[in-house]
Amino acid sequence: MIYKIDGDSINNAYELDGDSIGTAYDIDGTVAWTSRPPHAVSDNYTVSLLYDIPDIASGTQGIACDSLSQKIAQLYSGKIFMIDLSDGSYTQRASSFNLGHGSTGQFAPQKASQADLYPYLYVSTQSEKSINDTIYTIFVEVKVGESSSTINRAFYVPFDGPEVADGYTLFAFDFANSIVYSVYFSGYYTTTGTGKVKVYSLNDFTAFADGSYSPTPTNGCFVAGNPIETYDIDFIPEVQTLTFFDGLIACLCDYPHNNGKVIFLDTEYHDVYLVLDNLTVPFEREGIGFILNPSTNKYDMILSRRSTGVNEYYRYQFS
């Protein structure tokens, strides 16, 4: 089931395939969900334009990226961190791994207790590399503060689509459980499409010898083992970036570039959990993140967009 949130009424709940309207459930918890507990959001939200995020949470997980200007903005310890991939310390990584349309990144401490000491940046790409006549997508692990000539590790995941031109793969990371979600989307730049989610354990990647990328990873290259599970999804493309949040994969969509929406995929029930529609301002090739608001004890959603060469950040508060 998909529940459309347009700011005025929960009665606009609908199913994506249009077969039936279904039962509208209040998302504030007054009416129980049929499949899983409700999250702390409702059918109303307010928006404010932000240029600075106060330090209100430690080790906050989330991502906001701008692939047009090759900059990754990361929500970490309650603040936005900008890493310029086209100029400065990450130049070589950008050129080597072709960070472009759909690129994402997340700071990833290996252990919760090390969040402030050993932050890592995971960067997913839409690059492909042929290994034993198989098309692979890759994501790389970079330890923040390392020199531009090194990366930590490179991971290869089998491409999920029938052909490269038909779709692309993005990644979402559940760091607490050492899980990586490989999310494939078809129907590039169309209004309809299909998708596939493959779930991998970061512990099931095995080293292989022929992983020659420049710069060479300091700790080698690894290829994914068999997925823990695989399932198909229905979705509304054009997904630009995504992140894992509280058992959900939050996908920021911008097609047709004037009616941005966020689709939440349920990783437990393999269905669409929630759709936030009509996001006030259009979003194109931008990013999404979540941060705890101590005044409401709920998570606010942060979206970034690029406007006339300037990155803007919007906070969505749910009531």
Task: List the model feature ranges, each with a label.
Residues 223-268:
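Loop/turn-rich, solvent-exposed surfaces of beta-rich toroidal or solenoidal domains
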